[in-house]
Regions:
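…; additionally, a secondary subgroup of soluble metalloenzymes is captured
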Residues: 1-404, 411-564, 568-664
C-alpha cells in the first residue's frame, strides 16, 4: 500500500451514509492529509468533545436539512476520542454507520503505546520503514529502537564519544525533531551506560532544546580561548569557568561534521556571538559568525546567511509544524532587518522583497488548503490559540499547588517578540524562554482571535460577542468554571502596559488564585498610532521594553509561583493603501486589512472593486460573519499611504509566539 492514509480513507467512500460514527482514539482523522482528502470527498468532520457544541453544529448544518428532504453532497463524520461508540446518543447510533480506526491497525507489529506517542509528521517515515524492513512482532524497547533508527536516524550503538553525541543532538535540536519523551528516556538510559558521558547533563540536554543551546553557548567562549591559546593552559574542569551545566568544558566545535551547524546556529539567533580578538583566531569562515567583530560586517554577513537559510527551508507541501518552525527563521530575519542601524543595499532590498512575495503566496495557498484541519487538533501541544486554555488546564489538573499566568500581548508579531525577548535577556539574564508558536484565528482581529484564546472555543460559539471584547472576562471565567475552579480561583486583568498598580499587585498575591489571564495592550496602542512603519514598531517596542514593565511583571508572576505563558492574539504587517471602498455603512467593520459583512452578497460587491482581495471562507466563524481580506501587504486605505495594521493572512499576522517563561 502506498500510504498509511489509504488504510483509513478506504473506510470513507462518498455517498455511503449521511452520517458515519468513528471511534478515533489516536486522532487520525485530524491529520492534515486525511482531513484534506475527507473534505474533498464531501465529508465534514464534527468532534464529539462537547455534546452541546456538537448538537449545535449537527442539528443546524445537517439534520435540519436532511429532515426537510434537502439533497446535499455533505456527509457528517462524528469523531469520538475513545473506542466507546455505544455510549453515543441513541438517535445517532440508529442513524449512523460505525467505523473504528487505530494506529494498532496500521502498525500491527510495533508496540501500540509507543507508536501512539509519535507526532503525525513522522508516520509516513515509520510506515515506509515498516513496509521495507517487515519487522516481526516488536516489544516496547525494540519499537523505541526501531523508531530511533528509521524515523530519526539515531543509532544509539554508534554514539561512542563526545563528537558523536554532539552531532546527534545538534541535528535533533536544529531541525526541531519532536522525539516522544518515552523514546528520549530509552535513549538517555542507553547513553548513561557509557562512562564517557557520565558527567554530561543528559536528562536535560537530550530532550530540552533551549537547555542544549545554553549548554553550547557557555562553552563557546572556552573553545575560542583554546584556539587563541593554541591549546595551551586549557582546563577541562567546569568549575573553573563557573558553568551552569555539568559536563566537559571543552567541546569539539571544530570537528568537520559539527562545525557545519555552528554558523547556522549563530546566524539564526540560536547561539549568540561573543567578544574575541579575531587576530588570535584561525581565518576560518565558520568561526566568524560566533565572534563580535566589526558590527556592520557582522550584520551583512548574518542577514545574507539568514536569507540563504530561509530560501533553503521553503518547500512545497509544507505541514503546519514546518510553517511554525519556519516562522522563527523568518522572524529573526525581519527583526534583523528592522532593528539595525545599517541600511540595506538595494540588492538586499530586492532580495527581501522577492522573499516576502514568495512567502506570502506560498503561505496563502497553504492557509486556504489546510487551515481548517488545524482547528480540532489535540491541545496537548497547542497549534491554535483556542487550544491554549485546554493545554493550561491539563497542566493545572492534578496538583492544587500549580498556579498559571496566561499573559497575552495584544498585537505582538513574532519578529517583534524577537526584539522584546532580546531586551528582556539584557535586563535579566536569568530569564529563560521555551519558544514555540501557534496559529491565530482568521481574520486576525482582536475580537475574534483574542476572545478565542481566552474562551478556549471556536469563534462560532460566541457569535453575540464576536464584534466586541466586552464579555471576554466572562468567557475566561466560564472556561475555568467548566474545569471545576471557583470564582475565587480565577482572575482577569486587562489594560496593562505602563505600570503595575497596587490593585493589580493585590490580585496577583491572593492566596486562593489558581489561574490569571492578563492582557498587555501597549503594543496594539503603539501600532495604531504608528506612522514610521515596521521599523518604527521595533524601535518603540525596544524603548518600551527597556523601561522595565515586562521584566517587572514577569518577576512578580514568577516570584508568586506562577507558571508563566506568553502569547499574542495576532501580529501585524506594514501595508500600502490600494484605495478605500466607497460603500457607506455597508461593512460592519471597516478595517484597513479586512472588511466584515453580515451578508455575503455585500462582500462580493466590494470584491468587484478590489479583484485581488480574498473572500475568506468562514472557517469556525458565526454564520453572519463574512470577511473580505486585502491583498498581500495591501490595505483598504488611501492609495499610496503606508500603515502598520492587522486582520489579514500574512505569516506575520497569523503565526503568533507561544512562550513558557522560567527563571534560572
Amino acid at each position: 500500500m502506498a500510504s498509511w492514509r489509504d488504510i483509513i480513507l478506504s473506510e470513507f467512500q462518498p455517498q455511503i451514509a449521511h452520517i458515519t460514527l468513528v471511534a478515533d482514539p489516536d486522532g487520525l482523522l485530524l491529520e492534515e492529509g486525511i482531513f484534506e482528502e475527507m473534505r474533498a470527498r464531501g465529508f465534514d468532520l464534527i468532534p464529539f468533545d462537547d455534546n452541546v457544541a456538537f448538537r449545535y453544529i449537527y442539528e443546524s448544518k445537517f439534520r435540519s436539512r436532511w429532515d426537510n428532504g434537502e439533497e446535499t453532497d455533505s456527509m457528517a463524520v462524528l469523531r469520538l476520542t475513545s473506542n466507546e461508540l455505544d455510549l453515543l446518543p441513541y438517535d445517532l447510533l440508529q442513524a449512523g454507520r460505525k467505523v473504528s480506526i487505530s494506529l494498532a491497525d496500521i502498525f500491527p507489529n510495533l508496540s501500540y503505546p509507543i507508536v501512539a506517542t509519535l507526532d503525525f509528521i513522522y508516520l509516513d517515515t515509520l510506515f515506509q520503514a515498516q513496509e521495507k524492513f517487515s519487522p516481526g512482532r516488536l516489544g516496547d524497547n525494540a519499537t523505541k529502537s526501531f523508531i530511533l533508527r528509521y524515523v530519526f536516524e539515531i543509532i544509539p550503538e554508534f554514539i561512542k564519544e563526545p563528537k558523536d553525541l554532539l552531532l546527534v543532538l545538534l541535528r535533533r535540536h536544529y531541525l526541531g525533531m519532536r522525539i516522544p519523551p518515552i523514546v528520549d528516556e530509552y535513549l538517555i538510559q542507553f547513553l548513561q551506560q557509557n562512562e564517557m558521558f557520565k558527567d554530561w547533563p543528559l536528562d536535560i540536554i537530550v530532550s530540552d532544546r533551549q537547555a542544549f543551546f545554553a549548554f553550547l553557548q557557555e562553552r563557546w567562549p572556552i573553545f575560542l580561548n583554546t584556539l587563541a591559546l593554541k591549546g595551551n593552559e586549557v582546563c577541562e574542569e567546569p568549575s573553573r569557568y563557573g558553568l551552569r551545566f555539568s559536563g566537559p568544558a571543552l567541546l569539539p566545535f571544530d570537528h568537520e561534521e559539527i562545525r557545519v551547524y555552528i554558523d547556522d546556529l549563530f546566524r539564526e539567533g540560536l547561539l549568540h556571538p561573543v567578544p574575541c580578538r579575531e587576530a588570535q583566531l584561525p581565518k576560518e569562515h565558520w568561526i566568524k559568525f560566533g565572534i563580535t567583530i566589526d558590527p556592520e560586517e557582522s550584520y551583512y554577513r548574518r542577514i545574507v546567511g539568514l536569507m540563504d537559510s530561509v530560501e533553503e527551508y521553503l518547500k512545497d507541501n509544507m505541514r503546519h509544524e514546518m510553517w511554525l518552525h519556519f516562522a522563527y527563521k523568518w522572524a529573526e530575519l525581519l527583526a534583523l532587518e528592522f532593528t539595525s542601524d545599517f541600511g540595506l543595499p538595494d540588492t538586499y532590498k530586492e532580495r527581501m522583497d522577492a522573499l516576502k512575495s514568495k512567502i506570502d503566496g506560498m503561505f496563502q495557498d497553504w492557509i486556504l488548503k489546510r487551515y481548517a484541519s488545524l482547528i480540532n487538533l489535540s491541545p496537548a501541544s497547542p497549534v491554535m490559540l483556542h487550544h491554549i486554555p485546554r493545554f493550561l488546564a491539563r497542566n493545572l489538573a492534578g496538583d492544587k499547588r500549580t498556579k498559571i499566568a496566561f499573559l497575552l500581548i495584544d498585537g505582538l508579531a513574532l519578529d517583534q517578540w524577537i526584539t522584546l525577548r532580546n531586551v528582556l535577556k539584557e535586563l535579566d539574564s536569568r530569564l529563560q524562554f521555551r519558544e514555540s508558536a501557534v496559529f491565530a484565528w482568521i481574520p486576525t482581529l482582536t475580537s475574534v482571535s483574542r476572545q478565542a484564546a481566552f474562551a478556549g472555543k471556536l469563534p462560532m460559539f460566541f457569535p453575540t460577542n464576536i464584534r466586541t471584547t466586552d464579555r471576554e472576562s466572562n468567557l475566561w471565567a466560564q472556561f475555568w468554571a467548566e474545569q471545576g475552579l471557583s470564582a475565587n480561583d480565577i482572575a482577569y486583568i486587562r489594560g496593562l502596559g505602563n505600570e503595575i498598580s497596587s490593585k493589580h499587585y493585590e490580585v496577583l498575591k491572593q492566596d486562593r488564585l489558581r489561574v490569571v489571564g492578563l492582557i498587555v495592550d501597549k503594543i496594539d496602542r503603539i501600532m495604531h498610532g504608528m506612522q514610521l512603519g515596521t521599523a518604527g514598531m521595533h524601535n518603540q517596542i525596544w524603548q518600551w521594553t527597556k523601561q522595565g514593565f515586562m521584566r517587572d511583571l514577569l518577576s512578580i508572576l514568577i516570584d508568586s509561583d506562577f507558571r508563566v505563558y506568553i502569547t499574542s492574539d495576532h501580529g501585524n504587517i506594514e501595508a500600502k493603501g490600494i484605495g478605500c471602498p466607497n460603500e457607506g455603512v455597508t461593512a460592519e467593520l471597516r478595517g484597513e486589512r479586512v472588511r466584515i459583512y453580515s451578508d455575503p452578497s455585500l462582500r462580493t460587491k466590494c470584491k468587484m472593486s478590489f479583484p485581488d482581495s480574498l473572500e475568506w471562507p468562514s472557517i469556525g466563524l458565526p454564520e453572519d460573519y463574512y470577511a473580505l481580506i486585502a491583498p498581500s501587504r495591501a490595505a483598504f486605505i488611501r492609495k499610496g499611504d503606508v500603515i502598520v495594521s492587522h486582520g489579514g493572512i500574512s505569516i506575520e499576522e497569523v503565526i503568533a509566539p507561544f512562550i513558557e517563561v522560567e527563571r534560572a
